[in-house]
Amino acid sequence: MNVTVATELTRAVLGLSLKELNEKASSAPIGSEGIILLPYFNGERTPPLPNATASFLGLSSTNYTPENLCRAAMEGATLGLRYGLDVLKAQGIEPDEIRLVGGGAKSRLWRQMASEIFDLPVIRPKSEEAGAMGAALQAMWCYLTEKEGGASLKELTNDFVSLDEDSRALSGISEAIQYADIYQHYTQLKEKLWDSIEN
């Protein structure tokens, strides 16, 4: 997945531990002083750009710092997820909360950043094995649908997924507005890349 690839490659090239990556990213301002990462290290799935490559854009002699690169890696990956959320919204899906899973979900900074970029509350499940839990819930849903006439996935998740309330992050108005502008710029850059690859 590109989400952790972006931060792991940035962390590795800078020779940082995960803790140091978070500390450096925390000390950079929202927007990484103008640096945006298009995090397509392995192409991209949404939008479908399998041949796309990653790019750090907006670099200058004054903003090219480890702190800004770390934050831009986190922001770029999360802005990519926001694009996927917008695709879902265009299909009529309107979430009122984001449940963040995986290694990044352990980072308080990343949860807060995700909340501000999505402009929605973000929380993580108590279970760290989200993939296995999701597979088990899907299997249970299939079984109940076949044997007992159906079940609601929402009811199953409400019954079997516990949330870590201490992990909840809420978006601030000022931060959400800043990230809305950054997301618009990110989307414009992504579309230019898409056009150049398609043509």
Please provide the spans of the model-predicted regions.
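Glycine/Thr-rich phosphate-binding loops that ligate phosphate moieties of nucleotide
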Residues: M1-N199
